A protein has these predicted regions:
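Short, Lys/Arg-enriched N-terminal segments with co-localized hydrophobic residues
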Residues: 1-8
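Active-site-proximal beta-alpha core segment in soluble small-molecule metabolic enzymes
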Residues: 10-13, 17-20, 25-27, 39-166
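Conserved PLP-enzyme active-site core in the AAT-like
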Residues: 36
Length: 166
């Protein structure tokens, strides 16, 4: 639970511990990563910023030049938007019960693992007269989630025909 902020420090308190997170160090690390890699940076702030406070960590990352923010669950992305965190946010572990309409309304990118999710998101985007930004999760062999290798050709051939997604 974020308790407050003192300068470049975020104070996060739980029942058993208090963390003082040096946000300037996070900003420095993002800047070094961005300069060294020379490519866009997606800062992962899932799980409440790994227990460091998702909102202050996300804002520090954006301040340092992170191009994207990534979270596991849609409710985490919604929390960031509700705290006015700007820029692209990707939520990659979606559930059938998630409110995809709210995600579209809040300009959140979504990762899909099935044609059913893709079709639902497409229909919602069409009703809003916008294009949903979709990322396709591919099962790379761990059998955890994603479109299976055997289904990729079929998935992408159908993806190309679906309106209101990019």
């Amino acid at each position: 639970q974020l308790e407050g902020r003192i300068g470049h420090m975020a104070i996060v308190r739980t029942k058993r511990a208090t963390a003082r997170v040096n946000l300037a160090a996070i900003e420095h690390n993002i800047k070094v990563l961005k300069e060294t890699a020379g490519v866009p940076v997606l800062a992962v702030v899932k799980a409440d910023g790994y227990g460091h406070g998702a909102v202050p960590v996300a804002l520090a990352a954006k301040s340092a030049g992170a191009d994207w923010l990534g979270v596991a669950f849609l409710d985490e992305a919604i929390e960031l938007r509700n705290h006015n965190v700007p820029g692209p946010i990707l939520a990659w572990l979606l559930h059938d019960t998630d409110d995809f309409a709210q995600a579209l309304d809040l300009d959140i990118d979504l990762s899909v693992t099935s044609l059913a999710n893709l079709m639902e998101i497409s229909a919602l985007a069409k009703m809003r007269d916008l294009n949903a930004r979709i990322h396709v999760e591919v099962d790379t062999g761990l059998s955890r989630a994603g479109v299976a290798k055997a289904d990729l050709e079929n998935f992408f051939s159908k993806f190309k025909t679906i309106d209101n997604v990019e």
